[in-house]
Swiss-Prot record:
The active site is at residue 65. This is Thiosulfate sulfurtransferase GlpE. The gene is glpE. It holds the Pfam family Rhodanese. One of its GO terms (cellular component) is cytoplasm. Its EC number is 2.8.1.1. Transferase that catalyzes the transfer of sulfur from thiosulfate to thiophilic acceptors such as cyanide or dithiols. May function in a CysM-independent thiosulfate assimilation pathway by catalyzing the conversion of thiosulfate to sulfite, which can then be used for L-cysteine biosynthesis. The lineage of its organism: Bacteria, Pseudomonadati, Pseudomonadota, Gammaproteobacteria, Vibrionales. It comes from Vibrio cholerae serotype O1 (strain ATCC 39315 / El Tor Inaba N16961). InterPro entries: GlpE_sulfurtransferase, Rhodanese-like_dom, Rhodanese-like_dom_sf, Thiosulf_sulfurTrfase. It comes from the Bacteria.
Length: 106
């Protein structure tokens, strides 16, 4: 795969349930701590190496940001690092929350 793909929040949730996809949230620490999608990994510049050491490069990775814009750059970065199946979650956490999908809140 040379480029990331787009996925809507409902398809992302279904993929997490079916394929053991990794959901990574690239929002700022305060936003992530306040609320994030259930089982999301907070991917930052500081946690990138740890994520890459733990993740399987052939498992799907779903990238979430605020509204689905910033996640596109991060998704392409992960493709460039060798991840085989990477998706940008359209609408980001905003759409996830509006769809009443599972979240974890502080």
């Amino acid at each position: 795969m040379d480029h990331f793909l787009h996925i809507d929040v409902n398809a992302a949730q279904a993929m997490m349930e079916q394929k053991q996809a990794h959901l990574v949230d690239i929002r700022d620490p305060q936003s992530f701590q306040l609320a994030h999608a259930k089982n999301a990994y907070h991917l930052t510049n500081q946690s990138m190496v740890q994520f890459m050491e733990q993740a399987e490069f052939d498992q799907p990775v779903l990238v979430m940001c605020y509204h689905g814009i910033s996640s596109q750059g991060a998704a392409q970065y992960l493709v460039n690092q060798g991840f085989e199946e990477v998706y940008s979650v359209d609408g980001g956490f905003e759409a996830w929350h509006r769809a009443n999908l599972p979240i974890e809140a502080s």
